[in-house]
């Protein structure tokens, strides 16, 4: 058995990735979210596949087909709500995974980090298109509002929007292509995850101290396989609690009304996991400026390695930067809250202040704190 595991071309790759992989001996539970994201992706692909067997991507039947899945298909309600709430669990794990990377300086693995950012954008695009498919009110108007943002691009904007729509409004062509892309993208994401892991295994994992751990490695199996398994059990417990007891708690009631192009909902808003970016978008009273701020709010992650000024890798021994990091987390929670509120006083002002704070903390305060901490520890250049 050992010989097969270590010599067989396929089994060898699996062995070097998940069994005999040398891992740092001190990585905490914050390192569990990579495997949890893998589990989320598998759940989403499987439930999505079964949903696609019954779903029809036509404007006249899409809403009814989702109702049919919930009412008439064996365990259709379970599959549908696992898929919808699975997306929420996916984003919770994503945000915690990225936050871990920021806190412990994992962004110094440049290739792994940059592929991770591309993955984040791709997952966000996939989730957005998936939200359009049930063809409820919020699906339709969400698609209309978000795709319309591209019209802010000078010269080609309007043409580009109509090209994406496949007509002069969000209609049959839009729904069909969104379904096609929503079905295809998870497989592209899977391929990118493999590349993400490939680059990670070139360097090995980071650890909470940020210090090189080559002198103290342990095999991935059984130590981290059992630890990941515990994480998976907790994730599935949380997901199934959500699915079986509070399936609609994270959804919008407006999406239980079939799409009507003649009636606009009072408050158009995306799913909770996009609210922070939506708040940043709305805080700028200019269409193009808002779109640029929206993209910058995620793309700013690509600047993290450049903005790193500290002589230490992570924040474990850097109290000033730690404080700023947790202020940033609180700031993102405020943005998430504001994104779900109507555009009126005092929410507009709070949103603008939180948006300014978000960029200021990342671009100015954290690099400055790094320099101050270097001087406090009397590091010499």
UniProtKB/Swiss-Prot annotation:
GO MF assignments: metal ion binding; ubiquinol-cytochrome-c reductase activity
GO CC annotation terms, alphabetical: mitochondrial inner membrane; respiratory chain complex III
Record keywords, A-Z: Electron transport, Heme, Iron, Membrane, Metal-binding, Mitochondrion, Mitochondrion inner membrane, Respiratory chain, Transmembrane, Transmembrane helix, Transport, Ubiquinone
Pfam family, one: Cytochrome_B
Compartment(s): Mitochondrion inner membrane
Main location: mitochondrion
Residues that coordinate or bind heme b b562: 83, 182
UniProt-listed InterPro entries: Cyt_b/b6_C, Cyt_b/b6_C_sf, Cyt_b/b6_N, Cytb/b6-like_sf, Cytochrome_b, Cytochrome_b_C_euk/bac, Cytochrome_b_N_euk/bac, Di-haem_cyt_TM
Cofactor(s) of this protein: heme b
GO biological process: mitochondrial electron transport, ubiquinol to cytochrome c
Bound cofactor: record note: Binds 2 heme b groups non-covalently.
Membrane topology: Multi-pass membrane protein
Chain sites annotated for binding a ubiquinone: 201
Subunit: The cytochrome bc1 complex contains 11 subunits: 3 respiratory subunits (MT-CYB, CYC1 and UQCRFS1), 2 core proteins (UQCRC1 and UQCRC2) and 6 low-molecular weight proteins (UQCRH/QCR6, UQCRB/QCR7, UQCRQ/QCR8, UQCR10/QCR9, UQCR11/QCR10 and a cleavage product of UQCRFS1). This cytochrome bc1 complex then forms a dimer.
Note: Heme 1 (or BL or b562) is low-potential and absorbs at about 562 nm, and heme 2 (or BH or b566) is high-potential and absorbs at about 566 nm.
Function as written in the Swiss-Prot or TrEMBL entry: Component of the ubiquinol-cytochrome c reductase complex (complex III or cytochrome b-c1 complex) that is part of the mitochondrial respiratory chain. The b-c1 complex mediates electron transfer from ubiquinol to cytochrome c. Contributes to the generation of a proton gradient across the mitochondrial membrane that is then used for ATP synthesis.
Similarity comment: family membership: Belongs to the cytochrome b family.
Protein name (Swiss-Prot/TrEMBL): Cytochrome b
Gene: MT-CYB
């Amino acid at each position: 058995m050992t010989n097969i595991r270590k010599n067989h071309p396929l089994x060898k790759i699996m062995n070097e990735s998940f069994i005999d992989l040398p891992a740092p001996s001190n990585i905490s539970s914050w390192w569990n979210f990579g495997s949890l994201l893998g589990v989320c992706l598998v759940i989403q692909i499987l439930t999505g596949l079964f949903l696609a067997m019954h779903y029809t991507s036509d404007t006249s039947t899409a809403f009814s087909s989702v109702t049919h899945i919930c009412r008439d298909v064996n365990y259709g309600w379970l599959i549908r709500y696992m898929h919808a709430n699975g997306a929420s669990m996916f984003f919770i794990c994503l945000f915690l995974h990225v936050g871990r990377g920021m806190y412990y300086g994992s962004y110094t693995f440049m290739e792994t980090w940059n592929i991770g950012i591309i993955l984040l954008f791709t997952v966000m695009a996939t989730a957005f298109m998936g939200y359009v498919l049930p063809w409820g009110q919020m699906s339709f108007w969400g698609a209309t509002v978000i795709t319309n943002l591209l019209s802010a691009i000078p010269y080609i904007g309007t043409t580009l929007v109509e090209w994406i729509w496949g007509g002069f409004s969000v209609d049959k062509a839009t729904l069909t292509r969104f379904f096609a892309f929503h079905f295809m993208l998870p497989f592209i994401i899977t391929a990118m995850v493999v590349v993400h892991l490939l680059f990670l295994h070139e360097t090995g994992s980071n650890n909470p101290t940020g210090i090189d751990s080559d002198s103290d490695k342990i095999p991935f199996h059984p130590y981290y396989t059992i630890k990941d398994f515990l994480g998976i059990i907790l994730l599935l417990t949380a997901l199934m609690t959500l699915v079986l007891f509070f399936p609609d708690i994270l959804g919008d009631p407006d999406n239980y009304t079939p799409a009507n192009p003649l009636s606009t909902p009072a408050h158009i808003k995306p799913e909770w996991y996009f609210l922070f970016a939506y708040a940043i978008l709305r805080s700028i009273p200019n269409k193009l400026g808002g779109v640029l701020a929206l993209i910058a709010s995620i793309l700013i992650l690509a600047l993290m390695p450049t903005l790193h000024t500290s002589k230490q890798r992570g924040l474990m021994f850097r109290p000033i930067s730690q404080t700023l990091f947790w202020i940033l987390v609180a700031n993102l929670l405020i943005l998430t809250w504001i994104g779900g509120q109507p555009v009126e006083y005092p929410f507009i002002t709070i949103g603008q202040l939180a948006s300014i704070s978000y960029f200021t903390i990342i671009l100015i305060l954290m690099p400055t704190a790094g320099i101050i901490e270097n001087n406090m520890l009397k590091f010499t250049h």
